[in-house]
Amino acid sequence: MLSRQVIGLCFMLASLPLRGAAPLATIESMLLKPAVLCGRFEQRKQLVGLKNAVNSSGRFCVVAEKGVLWRTLQPFPNTLRLTRDEIVQMRGDQVALRLEARKEPTVRLINTVLFALLAGDIGQLEKLFDIDGSVRNNSWSITLKALEPGLAKAIGSIALQGGVHVRSITIHEPSGDRTSIDLVAIETGDSAMNVDEAKLF
């Protein structure tokens, strides 16, 4: 018969977060992979030297095989549409900026990283980052450190947390600036996108 001490140790070990390669497979199995995922975001950017954070909020959509829509509604309306081949910034119905991957090679990398972060694409993230993950109950967290020096210089380190979807993203930039993004009110399926968002794709 197991002693109370051994039983207690088993419970203690079971409650510790899992780490290493195995948890990444567990995390990947926990994440749903809908064709369409939309929700609201709340973003806080803390800049070095500024006491108050810069806050913004809006809606986002991640559409498989198409890209990402990032619509800032507050404090100023601004829309970013990121696809495999381009980044388009829109103000109202007007295109304010267009960056094409055939002219700017980094466009494809930026879009790949953002899509993987929002969708929780562990396989894609493993190609670009050194990943350390942990799982506790129905939640998980991972930290990302870029493998390529150029990407590391631009991004720094990233922390993700979530369950069946990514729920928060924190980016620690090399400059010391920090961006925290909470993803809330997440919906999936074609009905998750409103009419205006669907038109942008």
Task: Tell what function each PLM region has.
Residues 17-40, 46-52, 197-201:
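N-terminal leader/targeting segments and the immediate start of mature chains
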Residues 52-59:
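Amphipathic hydrophobic-ligand
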Residues 8-15:
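Bacterial N-terminal signal peptides
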Residues 1-7:
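Bacterial N-terminal signal peptides that target proteins for export
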Residues 122-201:
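Gly/Pro-enriched, hydrophobic low-complexity segments
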Residues 94-141:
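Flexible, surface-exposed loop/linker segments and immediately adjacent secondary-structure boundaries
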Residues 59-109, 179-180, 185:
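An acidic-aromatic
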Residues 41, 62, 68-72, 87-89, ...:
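Short hydrophobic/aromatic-rich beta-strand segments that constitute the beta-sheet cores
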